[in-house]
């Protein structure tokens, strides 16, 4: 994983790159000779700093998806809301989807800014026990595009993990971008020493989504990231009047259930399609408090309980 010094030029290739200290972007950089010698490619000292910072966080959960648009950030937001309903639990939500930060909108925090304190960056609070951090809080407008190369993304993730003053936290949920990219490698590398409970992988029933989830599962196994389980999102539509279920996205190859059986992965549950979930995300409100008795809410609660049970067993 390429890292980038704080005082590096904009297009720094990263200290682990074969071009470190040699590319045209390195001209004039104060670190050029160090990078060219290979001395900068050693273990990142930030790993130990992050390990110490994360010692105050009991459980760390990554939320992954193979493909965009399957409801990964929606799940992350509602996992945080669901866990925070227990007022005795301190919950933190970290958005590392650097180029597509949707968590501020979903949590009703659009327009909020990061504040610096003596102990680091202060997260933004939704409730007294629910804190959020996102690159979206660093943008002057939610419409601003983040056009960064991998090393700069890695530097931002490192800063989030090392410099945000979460305090004592029971659950840290990390919402990642879709796929398997620099951001995922960064989070896994930096948090592995601190102990990650595991990953929750989000999919929809169609094979076009499942084929990318299989890649995500292989990624987790290669980097030795435990898999808590898979959630099948948009799994049928339950009519609010007649209560009959219709398959909007038919599971042509058996859906997440068959895939989990084939790959020996736990299926945490299925969340039915509910337009009110999207409405809650658009308005920045918790679906649990807006529609507490809907089939989707009940499914979410069962899934969250299974995640909690898994984390408690790992203690």
UniProtKB/Swiss-Prot annotation:
UniProt entry tagged with the keyword ATP-binding: yes
Family membership: Belongs to the Mrp/NBP35 ATP-binding proteins family. NUBP1/NBP35 subfamily.
Disordered: annotated span: 1-23
InterPro entries: Mrp-like_CS, Mrp/NBP35_ATP-bd, NUBP1/Nbp35, P-loop_NTPase, YlxH/NBP35
Quaternary state and interactors: Heterotetramer of 2 nubp1 and 2 nubp2 chains.
Annotated [4Fe-4S] cluster 1 binding sites: 12, 26, 29, 35
Protein name as catalogued: Cytosolic Fe-S cluster assembly factor nubp1-A
UniProt remark on cofactor binding: Binds 4 [4Fe-4S] clusters per heterotetramer. Contains two stable clusters in the N-termini of nubp1 and two labile, bridging clusters between subunits of the nubp1-nubp2 heterotetramer.
Pfam families (alphabetical): ParA
GO biological process: iron-sulfur cluster assembly
GO molecular function: 4 iron, 4 sulfur cluster binding; ATP binding; ATP-dependent FeS chaperone activity; iron-sulfur cluster binding; metal ion binding
Binding site for ATP: 66-73
GO cellular component terms listed in the entry, alphabetical order: cytosol
Subcellular location(s) of the protein: Cytoplasm
Cofactor(s) listed in the protein's UniProt record: [4Fe-4S] cluster
Binding-site residues, [4Fe-4S] cluster 2: 239, 242
Gene field: nubp1-A
HAMAP family attached to this UniProt entry: Mrp_NBP35, NUBP1
Role played: Component of the cytosolic iron-sulfur (Fe/S) protein assembly (CIA) machinery. Required for maturation of extramitochondrial Fe-S proteins. The nubp1-nubp2 heterotetramer forms a Fe-S scaffold complex, mediating the de novo assembly of an Fe-S cluster and its transfer to target apoproteins.
Species for this entry: Xenopus laevis
Keywords: 4Fe-4S, ATP-binding, Cytoplasm, Iron, Iron-sulfur, Metal-binding, Nucleotide-binding
